[in-house]
Amino acid sequence: MAKKLPPMHPGEVLREEFLVPLSLSAGALAKVCGVPRTRIERIANEETAITTDTALRLSKALNTSAQLWLNLQNAYDVRTAELGIGRELDKIKPIVTAA
């Protein structure tokens, strides 16, 4: 079985696909979004999650969709949880089988 890649935090995408290439500081993006600078810094540093509010603001400022940011966060959360409880999940037997 192939090893799964570690989860990618949405802050990595924000940092590597937007902040760095656009030479945009966290403070400048925060100002456009109308949020505290620390919120963008903590996301970009992979220290906090992207909320629905932040996703909506990022989508407007960066011309993306809110769903992009929420999907990235959801994928990160699910993968992180899988890593945390993977052995417990392996013990669960399905009670419904696929048709």
Identify the residue ranges that each predicted region occupies:
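A short, Lys/Arg-rich alpha-helix, primarily the initiator
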Residues: 1-24
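Alpha-helical hinge/cap motifs
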Residues: 23, 46-47, 63
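Alpha-helical residues within the helix-turn-helix
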Residues: 20, 31, 60
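Short, basic-rich loop-to-helix N-cap that marks the start of a DNA-contacting helix
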Residues: 47-60
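Short alpha-helical DNA-recognition segment
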Residues: 23-42
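The DNA-recognition helices of helix-turn-helix-type DNA-binding domains
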Residues: 36, 47, 73-76
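Short, charged recognition helix plus adjacent turn
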Residues: 70-99
